[in-house]
Amino acid sequence: MTITPEIKQRVTQLRQQLQKANYAYYVLDDPIMEDAVYDQLYRELDSLEKEHPQLITPDSPTQRVGDQPASQFVSVTHNIPLYSLENAFNLEELKAWEKRWQRSYEKEEFTSVEYVCELKIDGSALALTYENGLFVRGVTRGDGTTGEEITQNVRTIRSIPLKLNIDNPPPIVEVRGEAFLPLDEFDRINQEREEKGDALFANPRNAAAGTLRQLDPKIVDQRRLQFFAYTLHLEEAEISSQWESLNYLENSGFLVNPHRKLCQFLDEVEAYFKQWETARKDLPYMTDGVVVKINNYSLQKALGFTQKFPRWAIALKYPAEEAPTLVKNIVVNVGRTGAVTPMAVMEPVHLAGTTVQKATLHNSDRIAQLDIRVGDTVIIRKAGEIIPEVVRVLKELRPPNTQPYEMPDRCPECDSPLIRPSGEAVIRCMNLSCEAILRGSLVHWASRDALDIRGLGEKIVVLLIENGLVNSIADLYYLTPETIANLERMGSKSADNLIKAIEGSKQQPFSRVLYGLGIRYVGSVTANLLVENFPSIDQLSQASFASLSSVYGVGEEIAQSIIDWFSIEKNCDLIKQLKKVGLQLETTSSEQITVEPSLTPFSGKTFVITGTLPTLTRNEAKALIEQAGGKVTGSVSKKTDYLLVGEKAGSKLTQAEKLGINQLSEADLLRLLNSE
């Protein structure tokens, strides 16, 4: 059919009118067109494009929702990595962050520093790419280096422009931001799911993440996600600050959080945080803190990055939420190291955006300290809005005839005697054949930071064990699609994918294999340090206590743990089996592992420990600190950076207070370690 100039002009007019209406409605929240008029114009444009498909452009409003579902998502490497942010859980930690960056870069031109404050939106981070002003790619954050391309789904988000609203756009524009579900939309979706008998989403963040990974973009479109842009990357652009970037994004057609603020001093940042700590309850979306960034790009560049975080930004998290609930039962779980951890099973309670039914009680000492009993009303808290814990018992509400809880003396999984090793706060099952230990070891082996075997979660691990298919980590590598296809929830396609993932894990580097073995105290950072100094499993297994403990960041506790692990015959047999099936148990020429001491969390920091800690022994705390690059001494002095304080602290606490030394609780220590 012939395309007349009048038709071309009409299509262009319709497209421009609809784009303006979309921007006014979804970004400015100021509608300029009645719904009926919008629908009429949309139908006219859609009809003209169907009659003349050569007139369709990628930025047309009709092209937001694709017709065909995706078969799968493809992993892609980010052009620019998406870093995590360091967390601060109180204003003192915010001040400490400022002192850290000031110490690391002292130059006159940055004596006056501005900070940009933005609400930290509780959603899913996305990376967007525009070429010559047109949206071409949307990718999930993933692990920060690689993510999944979900371009079709991202196109459905109306607050993301398909074409930048600027003249002469740069050839490449990279935008970062957060996709989220408004609270009213979250409630609507859950109401519909409840009516259909589907499982409810726990919180808006989970709902947003699950929505973005839908294969059918029509489902994504129905859920009405929103997007706040917060980072801009341009090549050779004359933009010198974060504040200018946010304005550029807004002028380009993006929705930028309207509550951002440019602060001249840290006192203003604190006031902003306190304001939104209260006012956030009135927002139409979830926010879990405030992101604070140094405004000046030159200073940002000078400060640079750690392994995981930009030094020029920090996330100041809101205080943990607390709520009362009833303890229905106390159960114990056996972990992969044999540690037996008591858990409180409670009446469901809504806390920090999720429904909580269980909370850790850590160990028998903590239970005795709390005097917690079945039937008690307790206050629970989500530290950092992640880990539920019982903080106190409301004994005035305790019903009569409750009994003190006693920890079991035999393993609930294998009935072996439980032992409390000398100097430890936890009791352990020492039976290496215990099914719970095997289950935990397999799940750890398959985890993202270890061998990263996709599809091998706890449910599949349980099925493999129950069906007698796996009795050790090495057994995974003898599985075939035929042997697992008949397992519950499996099927031939899933079986093929799982076996491919297991086979693919043979290419994971030695450092990941070492971490996956689950040697006590050997985290991913320590595994890298060990591999750098002992490039093969044979060298590591034969290393002396002196050579191990002399490695920076290892220390005596970790060294002894490694020696103990290799002294067990069953573990040595496992290494032989892993060699046989082809795992990487030595470094290759292409594998370069460098872990700078300056990049470890507590590098150069001196700690002193005083009092009795709630869950850790002094040796355990010391090992964790040393593993993170710190040093533990026996006395407080001006050179002490932190005092780790437990109950019944002695004169060291008094001395630290006189010297103005920072004090940490065990919870503070663990939060700092986890945030790294």
UniProtKB/Swiss-Prot annotation:
GO terms for biological process: DNA repair; DNA replication. Coiled coil: none annotated. The active site is at K120. InterPro entries: BRCT_dom (IPR001357), BRCT_dom_sf (IPR036420), DisA/LigA_HHH (IPR041663), DNA_ligase (IPR001679), DNA_ligase_AS (IPR018239), DNAligase_adenylation (IPR013839), DNAligase_N (IPR013840), Hlx-hairpin-Hlx_DNA-bd_motif (IPR003583). It catalyses: NAD(+) + (deoxyribonucleotide)n-3'-hydroxyl + 5'-phospho-(deoxyribonucleotide)m = (deoxyribonucleotide)n+m + AMP + beta-nicotinamide D-nucleotide. It is an enzyme of class 6 (ligase). The keyword NAD applies. CDD domains: BRCT_DNA_ligase_like, LIGANc. Its cofactor is Mg(2+); Mn(2+). Residues 597-676 form the BRCT domain. Its EC number is 6.5.1.2. Zn(2+) binds at C411, C414, C429, C434. Keywords: DNA damage, DNA repair, DNA replication, Ligase, Magnesium, Manganese, Metal-binding, NAD, Zinc. One of its GO terms (cellular component) is cytosol. GO terms for molecular function: DNA binding; DNA ligase (NAD+) activity; metal ion binding. The keyword DNA damage applies. NAD(+) binds at D35, A36, V37, Y38, D39, S84, L85, E118, R141, E178, K293, K317. It comes from the Bacteria. DNA ligase that catalyzes the formation of phosphodiester linkages between 5'-phosphoryl and 3'-hydroxyl groups in double-stranded DNA using NAD as a coenzyme and as the energy source for the reaction. It is essential for DNA replication and repair of damaged DNA. Belongs to the NAD-dependent DNA ligase family. LigA subfamily. HAMAP family: DNA_ligase_A. This is DNA ligase. It comes from Crocosphaera subtropica (strain ATCC 51142 / BH68). The lineage of its organism: Bacteria, Bacillati, Cyanobacteriota, Cyanophyceae, Oscillatoriophycideae.
